Amino acid sequence: MKQNKVKKMMQEGKPVVNGWLQIPSSFSAEVMSHQGWDSLTIDMQHGVIDYPNALQMLQSISTTDVTPLARVNWNEPGQIMKILDAGCYGVILSLIHI
């Protein structure tokens, strides 16, 4: 398992530059992962990216040192665990009501 670049940079107090992926394309994920981003977020909430698309995108990102993140549709443990198992190093949750 590769190092979580985002976690390390945050522990060191360094800024993290994150890219955003909303097109369901492993090719676009691969291109973006070679553009100097520290992390890339796969947006599964407001785009048309589903789990099979996200899995292919994660495979493309995994060939680089970019930290893969995902914003999931909702705060549902099964969905969160599934995307983490697929290779995400972090998850962005929205619509959290405490």
Protein language model features and the residues they cover:
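Short secondary-structure boundary/capping elements
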Residues: 1-2, 20-24, 49-53, 71-75
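N-terminal amphipathic alpha-helix/helix-capping segment at the start of soluble metabolic enzymes
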Residues: 1-18
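Structured helix-beta-strand junction loops
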Residues: 12-14, 64, 87
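Hydrophobic faces of well-ordered beta-strands that scaffold small-molecule active sites
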Residues: 17-19, 40-42, 68-70, 91-93
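Alpha/beta enzyme core
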Residues: 23-42, 46, 77-89
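Alpha-helix-loop-beta-strand connector modules within alpha/beta enzyme cores
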Residues: 51-72, 76-77, 81
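Conserved small/polar residues in nucleotide/adenosyl-binding loops
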Residues: 96-98
